[in-house]
């Protein structure tokens, strides 16, 4: 019987399993609920993984009792060694027919392995933000990812918070706003459906919902697209903060990553990247300044990319590589380049 290789994209909200043949063809897929073991516990996590793989095996016309050759799991929280060991033990002990071999890695590593063969940077800007560097040898380092209380700079939450803070500080006469606050102030009252600043406090404290608060970023983006100077200023600052995350990991980058035809590959994940044109000026400024300050002449170009396929593909590739099998990947199909720059 033909060998099958599996990959799992484990998200905080949704998860996906892909089954591939040994020549890299996708034979079946299955979707499921969150497999973030920090949120749901290890027991529920492995049950959901087994259930999704079982469903995918049936779709592929395979006996569920025949184990996969390997299963590569790209999970949020996949960098915690103790948690990973516990997950492996649970998978092996409870579901002996699931797979012969397991490889568990981070969501960032699975994403970059879907887009490029050798590694690169994953730069996340959704509700929160994070920057992870994956070198060709698989080693990782990063900047950010500590949540909204400690940072999340350049994220949707950060953009929304900056906008609200600038308005509050300007009205209080604590700090002069860089531009007129009129548009952002009215957008803020409209979005939160309150008549004044006191009404905003409910959304900041008693009824705080991070996703809802971050959603105000969309209104700032609309204002920026309409030409509001303050909205444009905030997005430029967000671009700068995201660029500084890349600058922060430059000293850790294997020089090999600068030498490919793409230059440094940067995989952009999250909805804030839909507003790239608004982020661009600040992003380029931060990279240009950081490159000069660090005298990083080998960093001569970069390419921004977006995934077109699930990071379960990268998970499957890493899982197969772990047991010495190379799964063919068409990286030009898996990810699309949307911006390139040479210094």
Swiss-Prot record:
SUPFAM superfamilies: Actin-like ATPase domain (SSF53067). It comes from the Eukaryota. Pfam families: BcrAD_BadFG (PF01869). Pathway: Amino-sugar metabolism; N-acetylneuraminate degradation. Signal peptide: none annotated. InterPro entries: ATPase_BadF, ATPase_NBD, NAGK-like. The modification N-acetylalanine is found at residue 2. N-acetyl-D-glucosamine binds at residues 36, 107, 129-130, 145-147, 152. The keyword Disulfide bond does not apply. Its EC number is 2.7.1.59, 2.7.1.-, 2.7.1.60. The modification Phosphotyrosine is found at residue 205. One of its GO terms (molecular function) is muramyl dipeptide kinase activity. ATP binds at residues 13, 127, 214, 271, 275. It catalyses: N-acetyl-D-glucosamine + ATP = N-acetyl-D-glucosamine 6-phosphate + ADP + H(+); aldehydo-N-acetyl-D-mannosamine + ATP = aldehydo-N-acetyl-D-mannosamine 6-phosphate + ADP + H(+); N-acetyl-D-muramoyl-L-alanyl-D-isoglutamine + ATP = 6-O-phospho-N-acetyl-D-muramoyl-L-alanyl-D-isoglutamine + ADP + H(+). Inhibited by the cysteine modifiers iodoacetamide, N-ethylmaleimide and 5,5'-dithiobis(2-nitrobenzoic acid). Keywords: Acetylation, ATP-binding, Immunity, Innate immunity, Kinase, Nucleotide-binding, Phosphoprotein, Transferase. The modification Phosphoserine is found at residue 76. GO terms for biological process: defense response to bacterium; innate immune response; N-acetylglucosamine catabolic process; N-acetylglucosamine metabolic process; N-acetylneuraminate catabolic process; positive regulation of nucleotide-binding oligomerization domain containing 2 signaling pathway; response to muramyl dipeptide; UDP-N-acetylglucosamine biosynthetic process. PANTHER family: BADF TYPE ATPASE DOMAIN-CONTAINING PROTEIN, N-ACETYL-D-GLUCOSAMINE KINASE. Belongs to the eukaryotic-type N-acetylglucosamine kinase family. Converts endogenous N-acetylglucosamine (GlcNAc), a major component of complex carbohydrates, from lysosomal degradation or nutritional sources into GlcNAc 6-phosphate. Also has N-acetylmannosamine (ManNAc) kinase activity. Involved in the N-glycolylneuraminic acid (Neu5Gc) degradation pathway. Also involved in innate immunity by promoting detection of bacterial peptidoglycan by NOD2: acts by catalyzing phosphorylation of muramyl dipeptide (MDP), a fragment of bacterial peptidoglycan, to generate 6-O-phospho-muramyl dipeptide, which acts as a direct ligand for NOD2. Homodimer. This is N-acetyl-D-glucosamine kinase. It comes from Rattus norvegicus. The lineage of its organism: Eukaryota, Metazoa, Chordata, Craniata, Vertebrata. The gene is Nagk.
């Amino acid at each position: 019987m033909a060998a099958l290789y599996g990959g799992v994209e484990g998200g905080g909200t949704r998860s996906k399993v892909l089954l591939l043949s040994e020549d890299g063809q996708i034979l079946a897929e299955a979707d499921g609920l969150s497999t973030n073991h920090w949120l749901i516990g290890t027991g529920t996590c492995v049950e959901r993984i087994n259930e999704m793989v079982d469903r995918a095996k049936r779709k592929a016309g395979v006996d569920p009792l025949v184990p996969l050759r390997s299963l590569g799991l790209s999970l949020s929280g996949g960098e915690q060694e103790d948690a990973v060991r516990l997950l492996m033990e649970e998978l092996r002990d409870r579901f002996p027919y699931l797979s012969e071999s397991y490889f568990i890695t981070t969501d960032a590593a699975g994403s970059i392995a879907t887009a490029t063969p050798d590694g690169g940077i994953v730069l996340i800007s959704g509700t929160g933000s994070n920057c992870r560097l994956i070198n060709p040898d698989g080693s990782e380092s990063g900047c950010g990812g500590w949540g909204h209380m400690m940072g999340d700079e350049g994220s949707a939450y950060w953009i929304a918070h900056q906008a609200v803070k600038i308005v509050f500080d300007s009205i209080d006469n604590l700090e002069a706003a860089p531009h007129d606050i009129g548009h952002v102030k009215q957008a803020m009252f409209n979005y939160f459906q309150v008549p004044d600043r006191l009404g905003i406090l409910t959304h900041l404290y008693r009824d705080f919902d991070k996703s809802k608060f971050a959603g105000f970023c969309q209104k700032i983006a609309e204002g920026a697209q309409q030409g509001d100077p303050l909205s444009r200023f905030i997005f430029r600052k967000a671009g700068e903060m995201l660029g500084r995350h890349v600058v922060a990991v430059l000293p850790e980058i294997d020089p090999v990553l600068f030498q490919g035809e793409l230059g440094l590959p940067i995989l952009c994940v999250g909805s804030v990247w839909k507003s790239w044109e608004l982020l661009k000026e600040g992003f380029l400024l931060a990279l240009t300044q950081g490159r000069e300050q660090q005298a990083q002449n080998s960093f001569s170009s970069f390419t921004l990319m977006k995934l077109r396929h699930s990071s379960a593909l990268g998970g499957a590739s890493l899982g197969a590589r772990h047991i010495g099998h190379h799964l063919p990947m068409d990286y030009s199909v898996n990810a699309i380049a949307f911006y390139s720059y040479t210094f």
